[in-house]
Amino acid sequence: DDAYSSVFDYAWPIFKKHKLPFTLFVSTDVIDNKTPGYMSWEEIRILRDNGVTIGSQSKSHPHMHKLSKNKIIKELTISSDRFVSEIGGKPKFFAYPYGEYNLEVLEQVKAHGFIAAFGQHSGVAHKSLGIFELPRFAMNEKYGDMNRFNLAVNALPIPISDLSPKNPLIKRNPPYYGFT
């Protein structure tokens, strides 16, 4: 996530050497603003040209569940326009900034033409999950040692149906969960 320059400088050469595919999720403002520590559009094009899937993470990486419907649409539209201008196409995949979303954000991401979206909740994708609510295992300097990696690649899903509440954004803690 986030198109940090360290991905281009350190992670990508390792992934490339071992022929491991990956997706880079990009918020366009930090790239447009040439924010230190982030990639450039040229580096993103190099990754794209070498088989890396480029996904969207919005325009400004906001807490999208706090935005109005119009602001959500603006975040998605401006970001998509920048991708079309800079890399010649709109990403098919979306990662919710901070992994946070509610039903309104999910619906707008879907309406905007993305084919799948990812949160930041750890878990294994399985057939009972919605394609716009896909989990991921974080792999970074804090949660990326070999034990964590082995746990993630060997994890099995716990298929749950009839999850309650339907809205993934929990405002009450402790929440009242129900599932079968």
Question: Where do the protein language model's features map onto the residues?
Answer:
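C-terminal active-site subregion of NodB/CE4 polysaccharide deacetylases
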Residues: 4-8, 45, 49, 59-62, ...
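Residue-level detector of anion-binding/catalytic polar loops
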Residues: 21, 53, 115
